[in-house]
Swiss-Prot record:
This is Maturase K. HAMAP family: MatK. The gene is matK. GO terms for cellular component: chloroplast. One of its GO terms (biological process) is tRNA processing. It comes from Piper cenocladum (Ant piper).
Length: 512
């Protein structure tokens, strides 16, 4: 690790983008496999080794020696002769996998220095701990969404041709051999079983190399968003000064904790907000939301801007139906596991001027956040807590654990969901989810003891409910009693609490 840090400092001082020689350094492979290579050296054959032993010191050293002695990297990536010119001849898939994992570490180096330079210029961003919570975005919506009228739901298109990705990364990686090697890996993935497609496009799957796939995806999204921001800035009458670079914003919301691991976070957790006087832009989980107070014609223009941008710059055909434009008053939109909507409350006010009295009708917009019950039950069904109809079932995989362990696991799941969905406007759905988890826990315990649920619940008594009715820990939060009349402030079902300790989406809420 110390050698790696020294190389980074040398790289930073000289500003020479020579990444390719790092492939011949053993410690890079240790970082790629997330463990050291100083353990005992096995002498078994590769076929008899597990995954942990396959990435051992002996295999890595032999691989480096072979790369020194022979020219394993055949650069030709032509569609016609690619089958004859594959990395390492494809005789050893293990070598290709080890090299690709190490290469995914290496290509992140230029981005790490980009991140460091951003933090050195604006160190106060790292001090904004409260804004690291993803729940902090909902009060932002609540304060601004009342003045907005239209929302555009954009599904970011992919896959993309490998050559377009290589051209995009040329601005960041100026080491020609590294670009050639990246091209080889992209074509390898396009021709492999999990990535194969008729048009030989690269799909951002995480089956082959999760780290490299996420790095390429973030680079692709960063490129098209940079172009979008440039177009938006030029089209605005006022010069926008409220947006920052993606790297800085990702750190701003606490998505990157280490300088070495740059732009490799799961894109399901990536969150970025672009704001000016007229529109708000949010990207989350492979989707984008464009909310504006402009007219429907303006939103349609931006829709075709997106389509032309993907077609002309990335050679992607994005069907128009992948971009939906709606009025905020007429629909709800899914964001960070919540179903959000704007509801209009009509009220009648009686006014009197001198001897004349009249009725005046006013409308007040209210920002609603509810739990998408159908999607959440679908997530619970995938985890075997219930069926698709919401009927609780026993979780057989936990039946071998102790009773206290089973109850603690179910209670933890229930508390985490209650904590994450503390900002929902209606708590009745949460009560139903708690009921499903409580009865699923009872069925699991009854299955373990070969008893019925009724008999088991009678035996446990009220103590069984403690794990599911335990109070939330007191943490710093946003609490908005002003959103409700005074008579409702004491009603727990109407309180919305946004916690400041939530830095990622709940696994069950992440159902898309």
């Amino acid at each position: 690790m110390e050698k790696f840090k020294r190389y980074l400092e040398t790289f930073r001082s000289e500003q020479k983008y020579f990444l390719y020689p790092l492939l011949f350094q053993e410690y890079i492979y240790a970082l790629g496999h997330d463990h050291g290579l100083n353990g005992p050296i096995p002498y078994e054959s590769i076929e008899n080794l597990g995954y942990g032993d396959k990435s051992s010191s002996l295999i890595v050293k032999r691989l480096i020696i072979r790369m020194h002695k022979q020219n394993h990297f055949l650069i030709s990536c032509n569609e016609n002769d690619f089958q004859q010119n594959r990395l390492l001849g494809r005789k050893n898939n293990l070598d290709s996998k080890i090299i690709s994992e190490a290469f995914s570490i290496i290509v992140e180096i230029p981005f790490s220095f980009q991140l460091v330079s951003c933090l050195e210029k604006k160190r106060e961003i790292a001090k904004s701990h409260n804004l690291r919570s993803i729940h902090s975005i909902f009060p932002f919506f609540e304060d601004n969404i009342f003045y907005l009228y239209h929302i555009s739901d954009v599904l970011i298109p992919y896959p993309i041709h490998p050559e377009i990705l290589v051209q995009t990364l040329r601005y960041w990686i100026q080491d020609v051999p590294s670009l050639h090697l990246l091209r080889i890996f992209l074509y390898e993935y396009c021709h492999s079983g999990s990535f194969i497609s008729k048009k030989k496009f690269f799909s951002f799957s995480k089956k082959e190399n999760e780290r490299l796939s996420l790095f390429i995806y973030n680079s692709y999204v960063y490129e098209w968003e940079s172009i979008f921001l440039f177009i938006r800035k030029q089209s605005s009458h006022l010069r926008s000064i409220s947006w920052e670079a993606l790297l800085e914003r990702v750190h701003f919301y606490g998505k990157i904790e280490h300088l070495v691991v740059v732009l490799c976070n799961d894109f399901q957790k990536a969150l970025w907000v672009f704001k000016d006087c007229f529109m708000h832009y949010v990207r989350y989980q492979g989707k984008s939301l464009l909310i504006s107070k402009g007219t429907d014609l303006l939103m349609k223009k931006w829709k075709y801007h997106f389509i032309y941008l993907w077609q002309c710059n990335f050679h992607l055909w994005s069907q128009p139906h992948r971009i939906h434009i709606n009025q905020l008053d007429n629909r709800s939109f899914h964001f960070l596991g919540y179903a959000s909507s704007v509801r209009i409350n009509l009220s009648v006010v009686k006014s009197q001027i001198l001897e004349n009295s009249f009725l005046m009708e006013t409308s007040v917009k209210k920002f609603e956040t509810t739990v998408p019950i159908i999607s959440l039950i679908g997530s619970l069904s995938k985890e075997k807590f219930c069926n698709l109809s919401g009927h609780p079932t026993s979780k057989a995989i936990w039946a071998d654990s102790s009773d206290s362990d089973i109850m603690e696991r179910f209670g933890r799941v229930c508390r985490n969901l209650s904590h994450y969905y503390s900002g929902c406007s209606k708590k009745q759905i949460l009560y139903r989810i708690k009921y499903i988890l409580r009865l699923s826990c009872a069925r699991t315990l009854a299955r373990k003891h070969k008893s019925t649920v009724r008999v088991f619940l009678k035996r446990l008594g009220s103590g069984f409910l403690k794990e599911f009715l335990a109070e939330e820990e007191q943490v710093l939060s946003f609490f908005f009693p002003r959103s409700y009349p005074t008579s409702y402030r004491s009603n727990k079902d109407k309180e919305r609490i946004w916690y400041l300790d939530i830095t990622h989406t709940n696994d069950l809420a992440n159902h898309e």
